[in-house]
Amino acid sequence: MSHSVLPQLKPKDFASDQEVRWCPGCGDYAILKAIQKTLSELEVPRENSVFISGIGCSSRFPYYMATYGFHTIHGRAPAVATGTKLANPDLDVWVITGDGDGLSIGGNHLVHALRRNIDLNIILFNNEIYGLTKGQVSPTSKRGTLSPTTPRGSVANPLSQATMALGVGARFVARSVDINHAHLVEVRKQSHGYAGTSFVEMINKWI
């Protein structure tokens, strides 16, 4: 009895047919390419993968992946992802969020997802600003940042996601940067291999 062997998927096989609509030069492009390469090298089946996002520039992500996807409401991606994983334990569940979406209105959902430690891959894009709504300060904006909502400068100190994640009991916490493609891929591989909630902060530029 012969068994057919499926060809290994390439990074481009994880790209959907949708036009990528981020601003030219945005670091989100590099993160998208790195995750597509990661899934290819890990030989993750597309039909077993789902990307779940909230609202913001990073939250366009599910549209650009040739996998299952769910574009939810502001800040609720970790809650939807938790339900998805509990109902479908065999699914490879990824959460895509940003510093505004995940640390402001969605901060409570993120905290409890990290605390529960079920098998989720959480990626937080940190560009230190609300990019989609044209540059208001976010929870990670540096003190003194000038913006439409802080014309005299932000008075708050930036929130450290890594410190917060460790403080609520996260077991896998990492950080990478959009300009180091090899490191992006390696960090994603390691976090994917962790059998619990992994949290990776992706520092990326905003144009």
Task: Identify the residue ranges that each predicted region occupies.
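Short, charged low-complexity linear segments at domain edges
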Residues: 1-10
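Conserved thiamine diphosphate
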Residues: 10, 90, 138-193
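Active-site diphosphate/adenylate-binding microenvironment
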Residues: 12-73
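Beta-strand segments within the central parallel beta-sheet cores of soluble alpha/beta enzyme folds
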Residues: 48-54, 95-98, 124, 176, ...
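Thiamine diphosphate
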Residues: 57-131, 183
